[in-house]
A protein has these predicted regions:
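Acidic/glycine-enriched connector segments
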Residues: 1-174
Length: 177
């Protein structure tokens, strides 16, 4: 992905239990700035995690993100996850999916987002969830330009601040994980 997007790469991700958390942790470890879009306010989002330790780790990782937003609408699940997927589809220049290869199981799931990224022609690298083999679903075109070329992180964040009703910044409250 760095070869495709260059050193100015910024990750934009959800933070759902499972692969989203692994991706976010990898971004932190590799020092890739990440913008996180949550489907709900944190108090509600926490209920979607069966494992309290996984939720605590997700909160810590979100706390070091470049920025954290709540998707507009605060719909119920799975619609809220679909809103996050739509926002990611709208803004991502490329995707990295960890996917089991199964057909879509519902609104906002990985299978649905994989299909939509393919239909939109967004370069997408898929890592097989079982064997971890990686392949391009939609390979990048040579010389492809970014769909959204913001000259600086500040301009990107200003744009997102204007778009989202809620930006959640600041340190994690230790009392909540």
């Amino acid at each position: 992905m760095r070869e495709l997007l260059g050193k100015r790469m910024i990750a934009i991700t959800g933070a759902a239990a499972g692969a989203d958390g692994v991706f976010l942790k990898t971004c932190v470890e590799l020092r890739i700035p990440a913008i996180v879009i949550l489907p709900f306010p944190e108090e509600r989002f926490a209920r979607d995690f069966e494992d309290a330790e996984e939720w605590a780790m997700t909160r810590r990782l979100c706390g070091v993100a470049l920025a954290k937003y709540v998707a507009p609408g605060c719909h119920g699940a799975p619609e809220a996850y679909q809103v996050v997927s739509r926002l990611l589809l709208e803004w991502a220049d490329a995707f990295l999916f960890v996917w089991n290869g199964r057909p879509p199981e519902g609104a906002g799931g990985t299978g649905e987002t994989v299909d939509e990224a393919r239909d939109l022609g967004i370069p997408s690298r898929i890592i097989d969830a079982a064997g971890f083999a990686a392949s391009w679903q939609t390979p990048p075109e040579p010389g492809r330009k970014a769909r959204h070329g913001f000259p600086s992180r500040a301009e990107l964040l200003d744009f997102l601040d204007a778009r989202f009703p809620a930006r959640l910044d600041g340190p994690i409250d230790p009392a909540h994980g």
